[in-house]
Regions:
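Domain-level signal for soluble alpha/beta catalytic cores
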Residues: 1-762
């Protein structure tokens, strides 16, 4: 049986692309040198996929920054202010992604949002009145030729017009529908060019179809593809979906003239039922997404073969594929030298999933000609089940008992919000329009070297901590000099807001090189929840307590919340998400109470990733996620005194639809990203009478540009107009870890100056 994948990691096995792009940004390598490195990355992954006998290898899945940004280029939908910079093609591309500040102009980046329910971010397309939508497919065809020269047959893969249209926003006076005809024409022309080049298949990805669809949405989808598909000629079109099922529009999809349909059998809870009740067309190929593209556990062949066995007689032509792009998992287990084989055998990264697909392709072929029982006699199946059924260990009865004994009172905080606000203002002496940062400060070469030496056992813990304390001392001095009101210790002891806590919690295991792209060149190395989670010792208390002793101003204790730790880890598949969240919540609760005992009066519990795992179907939001997610957060802070102020922070997300739920987290202050999205959330805060004190980010830290005093004043004026001065905090939109120290200082100085100007008017 044939096999396929939807996409593949593009950062390079050892993050070669990340380092090359960052060198290019610093003018340390040329464009040609960057292109050569990119070509080598593509070469390696194509040859690996060919080696593992993948039948359908997608092209155009490589990107220098983001696939949606590549689609903006494909459609020539570049907003005018980026074109007007007069930069070359590659630098214009990066200006859209990062913003630009230089002799040719000063523009902000496009806004970023989470890619459905993943930790990946995409650039939000903006259609302005000057947009001239037309095909620009040079990248697609050059990469196809590149693969062909290697003896690898690939097919074009593109984000579909329906998804692009739904994710895009307009910034001018034109109605969005005015762009639709030209968008459709681009895809028609793309298929025509593919036909001219005798390309057999084109993969068009439409993940938007797995979200709630209205009748109007379905009508739009049908309109778009009726027009496109009648022009496909000899090209076969694969409609690829992922991240869920297509329950709202399955009937429409199977009636349209697609040649292949890719469905998710991993997260798509109703996919099997849809086929059982409605059938699957005999003239179409079913690309069955049965290998989990999001998680890192070894695939359970028993479950996969059961699905494929159930499809017998319902779908005649099946291709075994992944549930989504392998972009969301690390490259390979080959480079993991510190974990034991007893642990590693349970995992499967991108490269290993190719091997699983090869084995499943063979097993599926056997199954198509034999019974399920006969297929299960195969050596591949037997070896797989030996691993799947083997015990992992790391169970902790004490932790499980604690979770089981939790009562409603464990999730309720002392004092009403109004009482707490009054007491905290008095005790903490917090001024109006208090200025602060989100937590981390730039990770300089010295900070990274200190951590690297410690990890390599070149320095001991005492020397490591001594260096960290020096970094903290300088950070506190710097913040006092700038004039911030509420300080942070800089987080120099942690390389990642989740990995740091995971390293100090029982139940986690850690990799050396299992990097995953979050956005652009930002990569994360998610820890793996391998067993029951508990805190074995204080984690951050030492550093926060030291920082507080250096100043009279309040210093925030900095923690990561249970939902974010869970969402930014690779979770177990043998226990529920709620069970894991409560276990982590109990561990963070212990840390919160220890910080309070150490004299830390403001404690920030970041829930940067709360929104991103919200189920894609609204009917599932509370029962499948928010009901336990909000409780896990409240469990962390319900034991503190009324005069201890609890902060939380959220990163790039759409909050408008869960504003009331965020209020129900019962934090005292929330900070979040707002600058890239042009502060649109302010209206929703006002409409919903949001009670929590709030700090919408006044400038974008994901761009190297320094905000002017004037633009921060303008942002603050707008915030005060919408939500008033009494509940407003002033801060950047995220942590400063990835920024340079010079731009950080300039930006924060401008933030404080702008705040003083606004305060002088009140």
């Amino acid at each position: 049986m044939k096999t396929a994948i939807i996409g593949y990691p593009r950062i390079g096995e050892n993050r070669e692309l990340k380092f090359a792009i960052e060198k290019y940004w610093k003018n340390e390598i040329t464009e040609n040198e960057l292109l050569k490195i990119a070509e080598e990355i593509r070469r390696n992954q194509w040859l690996k996929q060919k080696e593992e006998k993948i039948s359908f290898i997608p092209g155009n899945t490589f990107s220098f920054y983001d696939g949606i940004l590549d689609t903006i280029i494909l459609l020539n939908a570049i907003p005018k202010h980026y074109r007007d910079l007069g930069l070359n093609e590659l630098n214009t591309y990066f200006a859209i992604a990062r913003g630009y500040q230089g002799e040719k102009g000063d523009v902000k980046a496009l806004s970023m949002r989470k890619w459905y329910n993943t930790n990946y971010h995409y650039m939000v397309p903006e259609l302005d009145d000057y947009a001239k939508i037309k095909l620009n497919a040079d990248k697609i065809f050059s990469e196809l030729e590149e693969a062909k020269k290697l003896g690898v047959n690939t097919h074009p893969s593109v984000i579909g017009p329906f998804t692009f249209y739904k994710l895009a926003k307009t910034t001018g006076n034109k109605d969005k529908r005015e762009y639709l005809g030209n968008i459709i024409n681009v895809y028609i022309e793309l298929l025509e060019k593919c036909n001219e080049k005798n390309i057999e298949w084109v993969q068009i990805e439409e993940p938007q179809l797995v979200t709630d669809q209205t009748e109007e949405d379905i009508k739009l989808f049908e309109e778009v593809y009726t027009e496109i598909l009648k022009n496909k000629k000899d090209v076969k079109v694969l409609l690829q979906t992922y991240f869920g099922d297509v329950r709202d529009c399955y009937g429409t999809i199977i009636e349209l003239d697609f040649d292949g349909i890719g469905l998710d059998f991993t997260e798509g809870r109703k996919t099997e039922k849809l086929i059982a009740e409605n059938g699957f067309p005999k003239d179409k190929v079913l690309f069955a997404g049965v290998v989990n593209g999001k998680n890192i556990w070894k695939c359970d062949y028993r479950k996969v073969l059961n699905i494929l066995n159930n499809l017998k007689g319902k779908a005649e032509n099946i291709v075994v594929t992944t549930s989504c792009s392998l972009l969301h998992v690390p490259y390979t287990l080959r480079n993991e030298e510190k974990l034991t084989e007893n642990i590693l055998k349970h995992f499967s990264f991108a490269e290993e999933k190719l091997g699983e697909l090869r084995e499943l392709g063979e097993l599926s072929q056997i199954l198509s000609e034999n019974s399920l029982e006969k297929t299960q006699e195969n050596e591949f199946y037997i070896k797989n089940q030996e691993i799947i059924t083997s015990k992992r260990g790391m169970e902790d009865k004490e932790v499980r008992d604690k979770v089981e004994k939790l009562t409603d009172n464990d999730f309720v905080r002392k004092g009403t919000r109004k009482e707490r606000q009054r007491i905290q203002r008095e005790k903490l002496n917090i001024p109006l329009l208090a200025t602060t940062t989100i937590g981390s400060f730039p990770q300089t070469k010295e900070v990274k070297l200190n951590r690297s030496k410690f990890r390599k056992n070149e320095i001991n813990k005492e020397e490591y901590d001594k260096n960290v304390f020096n970094f903290i001392k300088e950070c506190v001095k710097l913040q006092e000099k700038i004039g911030l009101d509420v300080l942070v210790h800089g987080e120099y002891e942690r390389n990642d807001m989740v990995e740091f806590f995971g390293e100090n919690l029982a139940g986690y295991v850690f990799t050396e090189k299992a990097w995953v792209q979050s956005y652009g060149t930002r990569c994360v190395k998610p820890p793996i929840i391998f067993g029951d989670v508990k805190r074995t010792k204080p984690i951050s208390v030492l550093y926060s307590e030291y920082a507080q002793k250096l100043t009279e101003k309040p210093v925030k204790g900095m923690l990561t919340g249970p939902v974010t730790i869970l969402n930014w880890s690779f979770p177990r598949e043998d226990v529920s998400l709620s069970e894991m969240a409560f276990q982590i919540g109990l561990a963070i609760r212990e840390e919160v109470l220890d910080l309070e005992k150490a004299g830390i009066r403001i404690i920030q519990i970041d829930e940067a990733a709360l929104r991103e795992k919200l189920p894609l179907r609204k009917e599932d939001w509370h029962k499948e996620y928010l009901d336990w997610g909000l409780k896990a957060f409240r469990l962390c802070h319900s034991g503190v005194k009324v005069d201890t102020q609890i902060h939380t922070h959220m990163c790039y997300s759409q909050f408008e639809d869960i504003i009331k739920d965020i209020d129900n987290m019962d934090a005292d202050v929330i900070t979040f990203e707002a600058s890239r999205s042009k502060l649109t959330i302010l209206d929703f805060l006002k409409e919903n009478n949001f009670e929590t004190e709030v700090g919408p980010g006044v400038y974008d830290i994901h761009s190297p540009r320094v905000p002017s005093v004037e633009e921060i004043v303008t942002a603050l004026d707008r915030m005060i107009e919408k939500i008033g001065k009494d509940k407003l905090w002033v801060n950047p939109d995220c942590g400063l870890k990835t920024r340079g120290i010079v731009e950080t200082v300039k930006s924060l100085e401008n933030l404080v100056k702008a705040t003083e100007i606004v305060k002088s008017r009140l």
